[in-house]
């Protein structure tokens, strides 16, 4: 059974201060998780986690992770601007994007970010955009075919078939890119790859590492390029369902270390730095979407209507994803009622849960939707004129602070051009 990081009584007090719906994050949990990750890879002296800003683009959260030694993985102009705003610059930023506008490359270069190129044609595009090729640069690899550990767990559906993915370069293209970049002045090279999403296996990172380590050794020998970093990107997942096993980051780190010792060290590459770009793993379990039951509807099914909707958490509507739900104050009550938990959008897929067995829900009950700390508010939108909700940080001393206010109608109308 999943546990909330706030009690029912505590949450009622918080909800009295910040009207529902809102996202709330557990600062202590975020910090402890970041420390576990850093410990798991401490054998690599230059290891750094670059938090995937796209997962939770909130400055206060980025700052917490920065204090724990993390950099920022940015993929757009505004994400770069947020990183700069919190004082994250230089090699503390990795810029991994695709179909990248020239303006984005210019800001990444200005900030001194480590740029990962997604395509061979971007070598010349980048040079035209900024006027030079950076001394340190990476390229994204796509091996094609399929990438599988022989498992069929929820979460592999997003990118377990690299051959169908729009990202990265082929083996021949990445070798050509390295040679071209070297001729244009690059001195330090890196390899990046992202091949699966939300993996629930301690073997994903080690398997990816073995692939990239072999590629790095081959490319350094073939091209003469000095490879100084390998970016494992993201993909380490979290168990959304209570009965799913969690990844053990210490076991994962040890598996990567063994691959490093077996492949890179004998190749004379024992100084290569490892990077990760985790988002979901860093944040998802440490964020709740808090909503209140405001309606009960009894037709062909039993519905509980909430004051949140898919605009606040779109994963269930978009992907059919499971998010666990706790009825606060009824944690120990029997789950003997079958409900669809829904929002108020004019779309029938606006459902947080379908045929979910839960305790009996009364109007006014607070519901916690678990694992909403990543790709929650970040994927929010304004369909039906809905306004994005607030974000609250639960601090280690039990106090709370507002880290993003709720949108207002004035925000919604701000970009509109009226005829009157």
Q: Regions from the language model: what does each represent?
A:
Residues 131-148:
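Glycine-rich, aromatic-flanked loop segments that form ligand/cofactor-binding clefts
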Residues 144-294, 358:
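Active-site loop/helix belt of alpha/beta enzymes
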């Amino acid at each position: 059974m999943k546990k909330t990081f706030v009690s029912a009584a505590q949450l009622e007090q918080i909800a009295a201060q910040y009207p529902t719906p809102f996202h709330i994050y557990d600062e202590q949990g975020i910090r402890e998780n970041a420390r576990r990750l850093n410990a798991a890879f401490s054998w690599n002296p230059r290891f750094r986690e670059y938090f995937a800003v796209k997962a939770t683009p909130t400055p206060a959260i980025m700052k917490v992770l920065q204090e724990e030694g993390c950099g920022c993985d940015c993929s757009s102009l505004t994400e770069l601007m947020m990183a700069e705003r919190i004082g994250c610059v230089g090699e503390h930023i990795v810029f991994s994007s695709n179909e990248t506008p020239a303006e984005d490359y210019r800001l990444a270069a200005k900030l001194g970010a480590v740029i990962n190129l997604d395509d061979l044609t971007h070598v010349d595009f980048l040079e035209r955009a900024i006027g030079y090729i950076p001394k340190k640069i990476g390229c994204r690899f796509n091996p094609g075919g399929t990438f599988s550990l022989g498992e069929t767990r929820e979460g592999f559906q997003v990118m377990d078939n690299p051959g169908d993915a729009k990202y990265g370069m082929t083996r021949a293209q990445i070798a050509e890119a390295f040679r071209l970049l070297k001729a244009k002045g690059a001195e330090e090279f890196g390899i990046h790859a992202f091949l699966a999403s939300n993996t629930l296996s301690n073997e994903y990172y080690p398997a990816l590492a073995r692939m990239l380590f072999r590629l790095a050794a081959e490319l350094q020998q073939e091209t003469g390029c000095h490879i100084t970093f390998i970016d494992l990107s993201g993909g380490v997942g979290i168990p959304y369902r209570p009965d799913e096993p969690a990844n053990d980051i210490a076991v994962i780190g040890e598996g990567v270390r063994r691959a490093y010792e077996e492949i890179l060290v004998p190749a004379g590459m024992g100084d290569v730095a490892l990077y990760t770009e985790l988002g979901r793993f860093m944040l998802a379990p440490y964020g709740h979407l808090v909503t209140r039951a405001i309606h009960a509807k009894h037709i062909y099914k039993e519905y509980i209507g909430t004051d949140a909707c898919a605009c606040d958490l779109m994963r269930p509507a978009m992907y059919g994803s499971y998010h666990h739900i706790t009825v606060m104050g009824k944690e120990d009550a029997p789950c003997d009622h079958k409900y669809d938990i829904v929002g108020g959008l004019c779309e029938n897929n606006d459902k947080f849960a379908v045929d979910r067995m839960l305790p009996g829900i009364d109007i006014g009950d607070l519901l916690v939707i678990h694992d909403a700390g990543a790709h929650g508010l970040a994927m929010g939108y304004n369909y039906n004129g809905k306004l994005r909700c607030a974000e609250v940080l639960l601090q280690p001393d039990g106090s709370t602070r507002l880290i993003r206010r709720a949108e207002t109608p004035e925000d919604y109308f701000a970009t509109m051009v009226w005829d009157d």
